Amino acid sequence: MAKAKFERSKPHVNVGTIGHVDHGKTTLTAAISHVLAKTYGGEAKDFSQIDNAPEERERGITINTSHIEYDTPSRHYAHVDCPGHADYVKNMITGAAQMDGAILVVASTDGPMPQTREHILLSRQVGVPFIIVFMNKCDMVDDAELLELVEMEVRELLSEYDFPGDDLPVIQGSALKALEGEPEWEAKILELAAALDSYIPEPERDIDKPFLMPIEDVFSISGRGTVVTGRVERGIVRVGDEVEIVGIRTTTKTTCTGVEMFRKLLDEGRAGENCGILLRGTKRDDVERGQVLSKPGSINPHTTFESEVYVLSKEEGGRHTPFFKGYRPQFYFRTTDVTGTIELPEGVEMVMPGDNIKMKVTLICPIAMDEGLRFAIREGGRTVGAGVVAKIFA
């Protein structure tokens, strides 16, 4: 079959499988790939290709992940699957694979297990917006009441973590039987694909979000004023737009009087572009690296937040020893390090390299942040952890 060319015209959605070890996440990933390729065209990936996940390094952390792509008539999906539990934890915290929605795989022979709960909690902490449930191995359960019981249990567990447990789609199927080509189970995979299409809304593109550019450098150009440079993270800035300088100091307002890229003057700077922004009436000393330029009112500076953190293992170049409460590392946000103190959850005395942990952080100066912002934890310029802002306090 001819390889379909990448369709730019279709909306692109990022999804992934989550759930307990051996509940069939990778088998389901292979089944989706096969059934959709068979039904709508495209390339099918085998279980072994997906299971043999290549190693990637994201911010110095080694993660094994498999990326596959598939299509429904209305959308193009990029799907990520991880072989090991630790890979999921790292993947979700570093945001190596941002998900617009997740497929929670639960074996109906087991029901929810410890990692099922942990993955749901992580999804909540890192801001995965939508979850669809695939109850797997239903061919091995003869008792309809038992299936109903497992479904209820999963729905309750999701509600416990503030997902709409009563309303989200639950599909009962068998990934293995679908992969073996049994029509009644293949139909369940198509039902899952239809649920992805209808339940996960089309993600807002970066360019449609409010303007934000982390400031990397500040220059003074005689006769013209102050230029800040950086890569536009989201949105568009146009000449004449009012912008705010947020973080580290008191927020100030100014106007963008010029945008340049590769020494050419432009009318606007867009998400993904590296540009220089000329600011009206701003002195060289009024701005510094680590602040952000943003659409007024779209982002605020904060100092205290709850985060979910993965602490690098010794093998990953992290610490060799645990840390305790009162630990004061640097927190690296976007372009700069800020010192902060940590508070560990009640009953937790120390954190070992390789652990993931929820912690409350208080920074010594405010940083422009939203929930979902990723950061690194560093000691003397060396990364020892990765985290995500889960909840802002102040």
From Swiss-Prot:
Note whether Nucleotide-binding occurs among the keywords. yes
| A Pfam family recorded for this sequence | GTP_EFTU_D3
> What's an example Gene Ontology biological process for this entry?
translational elongation
Identify the keywords attached in UniProt to this record, alphabetized: Cytoplasm, Elongation factor, GTP-binding, Hydrolase, Magnesium, Metal-binding, Nucleotide-binding, Protein biosynthesis
Record region (G5): 174-176
Q: Does the keyword Transport apply?
A: no
Location of the region described as G1 in the Swiss-Prot/TrEMBL record: 19-26
According to UniProt, the reaction catalysed is: GTP + H2O = GDP + phosphate + H(+)
Q: Cite the EC number.
A: 3.6.5.3
Give the region (G3) as residue ranges: 81-84
CDD domains according to UniProt: EF_Tu, EFTU_II, EFTU_III
Enumerate the residues binding Mg(2+): T26
Ranges for the region named G4 are: 136-139
Q: What Gene Ontology cellular-component terms does the record carry?
A: cytoplasm
Enzyme class label: hydrolase
Q: Residue limits of the tr-type G domain? A: 10-204
Q: What PANTHER family does the entry give?
A: ELONGATION FACTOR TU, MITOCHONDRIAL, ELONGATION FACTOR TU-RELATED
Family, similarity comment: Belongs to the TRAFAC class translation factor GTPase superfamily. Classic translation factor GTPase family. EF-Tu/EF-1A subfamily.
Subunit architecture: Monomer.
Q: What does this protein do?
A: GTP hydrolase that promotes the GTP-dependent binding of aminoacyl-tRNA to the A-site of ribosomes during protein biosynthesis.
Q: What is this protein called?
A: Elongation factor Tu 1
